[in-house]
Curated annotation (Swiss-Prot):
The keyword Protein biosynthesis does not apply. FAD binds at residues 14-19. It comes from Caldicellulosiruptor saccharolyticus (strain ATCC 43494 / DSM 8903 / Tp8T 6331). GO terms for biological process: tRNA methylation; tRNA wobble uridine modification. This is tRNA uridine 5-carboxymethylaminomethyl modification enzyme MnmG.
Length: 626
């Protein structure tokens, strides 16, 4: 029997990484919010790799933190190993990654949600989204309970129509043994929402005592730990090692001999899998010339003996999995605790969303995370905080937040989804960002804290601390540009010792710092007036000065980008009536309805000639309206 069980400003459906950020953002902005989880023990769960960050993903986590989100703090609180990746490649692509304690991460996030004012947490399965006159009005649970709301955020992860596949064994299921959300897909279809079917997979979890670490390479964390959250200057933790090993020719033989039983190749799996996280059977087929593949053995936490076998996700039958894992170096006697599996799930075509993550056709309905066709905890959380902020702004009748491609990786991620769409699980990568020298992980606070403060997610105390840091950076850069180092025996001895050319006339410290062989830390020896600064400030100063020329060039490119972004296209435009546009452009522009000429230019199938036609039409339309 149906009954009204509660009235809220905002309902969030799902309490994974997207749902947690969305719910917290809404509640912290003063909106009465309720978040539903199929199982309260799944809040903040990591059903795959127990890690946060990585290439491109670390940038997202720091941006979430700069806006006032929780993921960075949760990762810092539960990290068991921290490393910065890509150190050899330069600061634009430095990426922070933390191995986290999976159980403690979930507990941390659940506790944060439970203690958050304005936020209720409820176990239950949402089966229906209620809509009247093109506006969302609430949700219905399988029990018949109705929760009225002014806005709803969908953050269902991989639960929608979830189907678990292990070889020939197939059953309905969600991640980590949870039951799936069986009914919501039909509700979304009835609302005219176009659905897609994707697939992802996860490797086996194995018992620590069954592994021979003496045959593997130990991988330690960084000696000096960089935290994810800008609220933490340092992080002191006892780190746990990870291990690197390899598959063998025997591994590949076992896989090849059992491809006739691999669901990926028998047609049992219909969903499209992630290109950048292929299963081991996919890797063996696609890269047949490779004699071995890397395998990382990673602990699941401090209080468990479970180890995660990264690089070997699979949907092969369990009997094949046992042979396959035991053929890996150091895993000869491995004891599998949880078998690898693939999961198929329903998601939406993200082209149905505005850049605010609100559905174009249903006001007040927002969507975030894997339901939007992405893969990864960080991508989900990034969408979650934006969907949460915008659901709150929608309810308050205020302007919604859209970050563009020059402001944040979050902007790149969302723009890619709503402009280009995706036909496979989308993951962020540094190569997707045109302005990556500006969008570094170290300066995420400088880029986004002002926005977080203006919205209301950054406290006054944190904002003042941020302004103090910003001033320290500006003052030190100015000091280095004004301080002239005169030539002397001591100075030239120092320069020669560091493989640098001696000087014969006075040189500014900033110019010396631009020399690739000289670091900010090394220059302390000939810089007696140097102030004592926090590590994060020193890092920022060094990057800003060393890459000043490149940064200026990229800022000029951003100016050109902004010009096209600022040429807005009215919502009422009928593209079919614009002569000169190609048929494909008319179809794509009508479907996506870009907000600006800049966005239109990024749509696949819209040519530079089509953009010229659009620009001329806009000018004529302007003149005609005057």
């Amino acid at each position: 029997m149906e009954f009204v069980a509660g009235e809220y400003d905002i309902v969030v459906v799902g309490a994974g990484h997207a749902g947690c950020e969305a719910a917290l953002a809404c509640a912290r902005l003063g909106l009465k919010t309720i978040v539903f989880a199929i199982n309260l023990d799944s809040i903040g769960n990591m059903p795959c790799n127990p890690s946060i960050g990585g290439t491109g993903k670390g940038h997202l986590v720091r941006e979430i933190d700069a806006l006032g989100g929780e993921m960075g703090k949760a990762a810092d609180a539960t990290a068991i190993q921290v490393r910065i990746l890509n150190r050899a490649k330069g600061p634009a692509v430095y990426s922070l990654r933390a191995q986290c304690d999976r159980a403690r991460y979930k507990l941390y996030m659940k506790r944060v949600l439970e203690s958050q004012p304005n936020l209720d947490i409820r176990q239950g399965e949402v089966c229906d989204i209620l809509v009247e006159d093109g506006k969302v009005t609430g949700v219905k649970l399988t029990t018949g309970a109705i929760f009225r709301a002014k806005a709803v955020v969908l953050a269902t992860g991989t639960f929608l129509g979830g189907r678990i596949i292990i070889g020939e064994t197939v059953y309905d299921g969600g991640p980590d043994g949870m039951h799936p959300a069986k009914y919501l897909t039909e509700s979304l279809k009835k609302l005219g929402i176009e659905m897609m079917r994707f697939k992802t997979g996860t490797p086996a979890r194995v018992h620590r005592r069954s592994l021979d670490f003496s045959k593997m390479q130990i991988q330690l964390g960084d000696e000096v730990i960089t935290p994810f959250s800008f609220e933490h200057e340092t992080l002191e933790i006892e780190q746990v090692p990870c291990y690197l090993t390899y598959t063998t020719e025997e591994t590949h033989r076992i896989i090849r001999e059992n491809l006739h039983r691999a669901p990926l190749f028998t047609g049992l799996i219909q969903g499209v899998g992630p290109r950048y996280c292929p299963s081991i059977e996919d890797k063996v087929v696609r890269f047949a010339d490779k004699p071995r593949h890397q395998v990382f053995i990673e602990p699941m936490g401090r209080d468990t003996e479970e180890m995660y076998v990264q690089g070997m996700s699979s949907s092969l039958p369990e009997d094949v999995q046992i042979k396959m894992y035991r053929s890996v170096i150091g895993l000869e006697n491995v004891q599998i605790m949880r078998p690898a599996y693939a999961i198929e799930y329903d998601c939406i075509n993200p082209l149905q969303l505005e850049a605010t993550l609100q559905f174009k056709k249903i006001k007040g309905l927002f969507s975030a995370g894997q339901i939007n066709g992405t893969s990864g905890y960080e991508e989900a959380a990034a969408q979650g905080i934006i969907a949460g902020i915008n659901a709150a702004m929608y309810v308050k009748g205020k302007e919604m937040l859209v970050l563009d491609r020059s402001q944040a990786y979050i902007g790149v991620l969302i723009d890619d989804l709503v402009t280009k769409g995706t036909n496979e699980p989308y993951r962020i990568m540094t190569s997707r960002a045109e302005y990556r020298l500006i969008l570094r992980q170290d300066n995420a606070d400088l880029r986004l804290t002002e926005i977080g403060y203006r919205i209301g997610l950054i406290s006054q105390e944190r904002y003042e601390k941020f302004l103090k840091k910003k001033k320290m950076i500006e003052d030190e850069i100015e000091r280095l540009k004004k301080t002239v180092i005169a030539p002397s025996d001591k100075v030239n001895k120092f320069l020669i010792e560091h493989g640098s050319s001696p000087i014969s006339t006075g040189v500014k410290l900033s110019e010396l710092l631009k020399r690739p062989e000289l670091s900010y830390e090394a220059l302390r020896e000939i810089d007696p007036q140097r102030p004592d600064l926090p590590r994060s400030v020193k890092e920022e100063v060094e990057i800003e000065i060393k890459y000043e020329g490149y940064i200026k060039k990229q800022l000029q490119q951003i100016e050109q980008f902004k010009k096209l972004e600022n040429k807005k296209i009215p919502e009422w435009v009928d593209y079919n009536q614009i002569s000169g546009l190609s048929t494909e452009a008319k179809q794509k522009l009508s479907q996506i309805r870009p907000a600006s000429i800049g966005q239109a230019s990024r749509i696949s199938g819209v040519s530079p000639a089509d953009i010229s036609v659009l620009l001329i039409w806009l000018e004529q339309a302007k003149k005609g309206s005057k």
